[in-house]
Amino acid sequence: MKIFSGLFTIFLCAYSFIAVGLAHSASALTKVTMTSGSASERDGVLYVAQDLGLFKKHGLDLTFVQVRNGPVAMSALSSGETQFHWGSVSGANLGAIAEGADLVFIAGFINRLSGMFVVNSQIKTPAELKGKSIAVNSLSGGGWIFSMLMLDYWGLVPERDKIQFRTLGDQAVMAQGVLTGSADGAFLGYTFGNMLRGKGFRVLADSEKLPIPYQGSGVIARRSFMISSPAIVDGVLRALLESSTFIRNPENKMQVMKSLAKALRFRRIEEAEEGYHSMVNLYEKKIYPSVEGVRNVIRLLGANNEKIRRLKAEDLVDDSAVRRMEKEGRF
């Protein structure tokens, strides 16, 4: 009995030590929230990082929240309700900054316009978009600015050319809107764009083949948060860099497709293959934000908004955390 009692005591002590250690480990994770207004392969680096536990690896309990539109995300970020936003330069964030929000682009994972402008098969040229309708996620978010940049490149002006924007929802809903005829076209990521092409819809342009400067998907945060919480900022960037490296490795194809299929709610993993192929070379290795890309959108939106016109692109970018990543040898 003494031997049993002694072993039981040792076991109980060991169990208590492990339990306390696990509890301490769990409590040591810092809770942070990141928002995004889209759901496509552009966000795949986030999905993979979550599924692989890379944020936890770097001490973060990160909650990823999809919001319907940019203004809601910017309001939450500005108030401190959230700490990060994954997105591109848009009317929503430029408008918030123009009104005094303390927001900066801290990393650029996609520094170009990435996607396809898909239309019904009756439309053969960009000029035929006159008088037509375009599906967007919101009237100030990424989907809208993507479309505006494409129209600007083609020399089209929505007001003059009677082009209407229809707010439908996320990428899946926008694609469905084009499919059913609720809208004549939409700027879509490659996953949904190729799905429509396979059903006979026309791709007017692949934006990656066009010389349009743009700050695409990246990380936005409050400048004050960057100064007060550099360890959290660095943890997020390390996790995302490791995720993008994982995505580029062809051996990880099935895991990446599983993450994308789950996030986009596909019934079959195979439906994510088109998106996977675009993801492999989608993300920058050097994740410095694009000042020129920000400047291009200020030019476009500033034509009708004096406050945005007065913004300086250089003031909207803080690459200090990215420089720390480079010093660590992350790229």
Predicted segments with their positions:
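Positively charged n-region of N-terminal signal peptides that target proteins for export
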Residues: 1-6
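Bacterial N-terminal signal peptides
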Residues: 7-21
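Bacterial Sec-exported substrate-binding components of ABC uptake systems
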Residues: 23-30, 327
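Short, glycine-/small- and polar/acidic-enriched structural segments
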Residues: 27-180, 184-190, 203-207, 212-213
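Short polybasic/polar patches that bind polyanions
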Residues: 50-51, 56, 97, 152, ...
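Pocket-lining segment of extracytoplasmic ligand-binding domains
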Residues: 91, 172-264
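Secondary-structure end/capping motifs
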Residues: 227-309
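Conserved C-terminal helix/tail region of periplasmic/extracytoplasmic solute-binding proteins
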Residues: 298-331
